């Protein structure tokens, strides 16, 4: 457990209500639907770094089963209220599932992990997925790894795709795309979105 992680979790614990308000205009339904298109039946999805539970609620509305999970106690409380499903408080590196989920949705969450820790975390996500399972993850588009306004961020570009998904962690990329932030006031910010499949 690093100081960067502690600061980020503390941020969400103390500013949960403010964060919920700040993303109230963020509609991720298009990205969610793009992810859901890879499932031919009802899926069991781990919403990893679920935040307010916004996306968990949407997945449930589309007929899927979801487990919201977040390292922040306050975010888990909000997500439980929003989604109607009890969220699990757990850090990325403490994931302990095996062949459990059809999909893992990590929207704007893995970006809070330090770069050197991401390979191990992604291997744990691989363990949690059933064979052929689908992973979505998104990062702010860029090359920085730094603290910003009380939270730690690891940015990514297309050049980082082989680092994120490779033979060692058992993922192959199905598609990736660059999008603009869905919040009108942040339309100048870009995101790297990745959808990958568990291949081993």
What does each of the following model-derived ranges do?
Residues 132-139:
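Conserved beta-strand signature within the Rossmann-like core of class I S-adenosyl-L-methionine
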Residues 119-131:
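A short glycine-rich, Lys/Arg-flanked "PGG" loop and its adjoining helix->strand segment in the class I
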Residues 182-200:
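Core SAM-dependent methyltransferase catalytic element
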Residues 171-181:
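Conserved S-adenosyl-L-methionine
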């Amino acid at each position: 457990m690093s100081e960067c992680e502690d600061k980020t979790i503390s941020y969400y614990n103390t500013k949960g209500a403010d964060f919920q308000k700040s993303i109230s205009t963020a509609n991720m339904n298009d990205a969610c639907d793009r992810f859901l298109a890879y499932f031919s039946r009802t899926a069991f999805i781990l919403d990893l770094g679920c935040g307010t539970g916004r996306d968990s609620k949407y997945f449930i509305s589309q007929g899927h089963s979801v487990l919201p999970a977040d390292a922040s106690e306050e975010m888990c409380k909000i997500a439980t209220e929003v989604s109607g499903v009890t969220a699990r408080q757990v850090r990325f590196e403490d994931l302990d599932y095996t062949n459990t989920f059809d999909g893992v949705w990590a929207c704007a969450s893995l970006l809070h992990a330090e770069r050197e820790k991401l390979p191990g975390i992604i291997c744990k996500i691989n363990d949690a997925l059933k064979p052929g399972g689908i992973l979505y993850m998104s990062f702010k588009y860029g090359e920085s790894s730094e603290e910003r306004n009380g939270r730690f961020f690891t940015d990514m570009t297309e050049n980082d795709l082989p680092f994120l998904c490779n033979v060692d962690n058992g993922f192959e990329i199905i598609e990736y795309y660059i999008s603009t932030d869905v919040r009108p006031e942040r339309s100048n910010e870009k995101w790297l979105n990745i959808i990958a499949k568990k291949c081993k």
